[in-house]
Amino acid sequence: MAGPWIITLLCGLLGATLVQANVYPPAVLNLGPEVIQKHLTQALKDHDATAILQELPLLRAMQDKSGSIPILDSFVHTVLRYIIWMKVTSANILQLDVQPSTYDQELVVRIPLDMVAGLNTPLIKTIVEFQMSTEVQALIRVERSKSGPAHLNLSDCSSNESTLRLSLLHKLSFVVNSLAKNVMNLLVPALPQIVKNHLCPVIQQAFDDMYEDFLRLTTAPIALSPGALEFGLLSPAIQDSNILLNLKAKLLDSQARVTNWFNNSATSLMETTPDRAPFSLTVRQDLVNAIVTTLVPKEELVILLRFVIPDVARQLQMDIKEINAEAANKLGPTQMLKIFTHSTPHIVLNEGSARAAQSVVLEVFPTNTDVRPFFSLGIEASYEAQFFTEDNRLMLNFNNVSIERIKLMISDIKLFDPEVLKDTLTKILEYTLLPNENGKLRTGVPMSMSKALGYEKAMWSVSKGALKLTPASS
């Protein structure tokens, strides 16, 4: 638990950026329309949606549509007498469009279709071809259930006559053109229904698979050293044209035992408003700190100062000589320091920058055989914290030590103002504690989410109360 000194320091670091705090989940995966379009398009390809379009039963659809109207049925049979076969010869799904709905928690997905149909008639030796363009529209909604958690669902899939365009690709004889025109007139009321009946179930399956893929890549365990980090779905949401997956998290030790839960929304300074990035993963500050605590646990360092940093050892001896010359003369070749990390580094995330605060206890021993120190100091220090990406890993590095407060806890040489040691202590922490902690952070945190979403490079940025992962600009 952080002591009163570190709380004071953290309050100071937070004070400069204090804004009205809101309630946010531990993490948020924000998927923009570009990602939704790309992955739904791929899911439609995986389900052979274009092959489904090429199998549309055009002739039967015209017959079924006219069957209930005797006069129209007679006309259809007259037209069909001149058709040997008729089918969709090519089909393409054009670029999907994802837009916000006029209703809350709802997206509109428009799927434009471009098809060419051909018919064979004894009236001419060549195939009569005409182009059919239409659009399928569906809604993505957040569905809430009394018996289970909320989930995303695709519904109201349909195709409307108003989006249908048919045109003859090649003008032929008057008789053939008239036949083709009659066929197209019959297709206008029939085509939207067969597209709905045959393609909409495929779109539903493709959406369900896409949603499962999003959940799978989000909840895949992330290896830490030691242990692991796992995300889980709290709830989905829709904001503007974006899908938001509000995430819970848990940290596990090397034995896969849960050491920390983050399964509730909490007051935070973080901002999660969708931006123009194709996607973003926003991680709340307290979860960032829990990850850092896992990577950099509390520990004790023992340092033979003259062997490790002799220049600093001489400087410390000179400082002690100013306090007590007799004590300084007792410092031997095995002069020893012990550093106890009273707290793990606590990260404070501000807009565009981050700092870490940490409390340590430092003890100075004249030799490595002494059991009682010359003196013990409580030190409150802060560092610059730099987050960056390296090979799809979240990396963190500390540098530029700043000592905020020093307290003399025990002294066997005499009472003195510990501020006289500030420069030397800063160098000691710079040369010993920081390299040790940076070494533990060197493995980083693997984050393959960006690559799984189709972006080779990503970058981490710091905002108020949160870390954010977004694709790197090309």
UniProtKB/Swiss-Prot annotation:
Protein localization: Secreted
Residue positions the entry lists as glycosylated: 153, 160, 263, 400
Keyword Transcription included in the entry's annotation: no
Disulfide bonds: 157-200
SMART domains on file: BPI1
A cellular component term, taken from the record's GO annotations: extracellular space
Record keywords: Disulfide bond, Glycoprotein, Immunity, Innate immunity, Secreted, Signal
Keyword Secreted carried by entry: yes
Tissue specificity statement from the Swiss-Prot or TrEMBL entry: Expressed in tongue, lung, thymus, and stomach. Expressed in epithelia of palate, anterior pharynx, trachea and upper bronchi. Expressed in distal tip of papillae in the anterior third of the tongue and in serous cells of von Ebner glands in the posterior third of the tongue. Expressed in columnar epithelium of the duodenum in embryonic gut at 16.5 dpc.
GO process terms (BP): innate immune response in mucosa; negative regulation of toll-like receptor 4 signaling pathway
The protein's name: BPI fold-containing family B member 1
Species this chain originates from: Mus musculus
Organism taxonomic ancestry: Eukaryota, Metazoa, Chordata, Craniata, Vertebrata
